[in-house]
Amino acid sequence: MSLGNRIFNGIVNVIISAAAMYGLWLLMRVCVFDYFTIPTNSMCPTLKPGDKVIVNKLLMGARIYTDYDFDIHGQELKSFRMKGIRTIRHNDIVVFNIPVHDGKISFIINKNMCKRVVAVPGDSISVVDGYYRNNNYDKALGLESMQKRLIEMPDSMMRGIVLDAYPFNGNVGWKIKKFGPMYVPRVGDVINMTPNDAAIYKRMMEWELGKEITWDRQKNVVYADGKPIKRYTFKHNYYFCAGDNVLDSDDSRYWGLVPEEYIIGIVAKTIHSS
């Protein structure tokens, strides 16, 4: 074989090897792990801006897209999830796609958040005197030291902090210091619908049904596209996710629940920036 052919074959082999390594790296990021940089202080002091987290996708199962025609303005998420090792647990830190845009649930790729799970499907979550309380979990949720700061700080001192909470409905009347109880639906759960329930679950129901949810308080009736409904059966699992820095975190207290499909994976390792 001539020197020229040997050089050519060597270059081809290097290119093939590099392409194979790149393909393997992409496959690993899709199915096994991925990494994200923390952009805000919402998880302080646990995670600080600039920290990197490695997400284990094997634990709950990797999410595989079935439609790669992404719309940066929001769209329906089309995907399935591979079989995982375990379900999400209380106090897991997860990375997920921000679920709410323009007041409704929609999917935008590469718009992510990192928060702590304080309620899983089937739980009832409350904030009582500033502290998270869960009917199915009697240990601390999040950082109680930060929750203590929340309850000890007078409202008059909380400049720039939104005290009202999801669903921002006067009849429900929830605040970040006194919230819930809010039931976190799981697949197959049936909830009898009152106007207050409709206000709480409107976003999730409209996402699942593709119909407008309204209500008449005087008649105590809830409507889906104008048709009365007495109860609703949920089609998805949901999670309540919140930042450890309860004084400065945009989370489920303000925009509601995270659909399971939007969760990318569970944080397995942190690489601190300093």
Give the positions of each predicted feature.
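Secondary-structure boundary/capping signal
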Residues: 35-36, 102
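Cytochrome P450 fold signature focused on the C-terminal beta-domain
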Residues: 34-35, 119
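Soluble "head" domains of membrane/secretory-pathway proteins
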Residues: 3-8, 44-274
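Hydrophobic membrane-insertion alpha-helices, especially the h-region
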Residues: 12-31
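N-terminal signal-anchor transmembrane helix
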Residues: 36-46
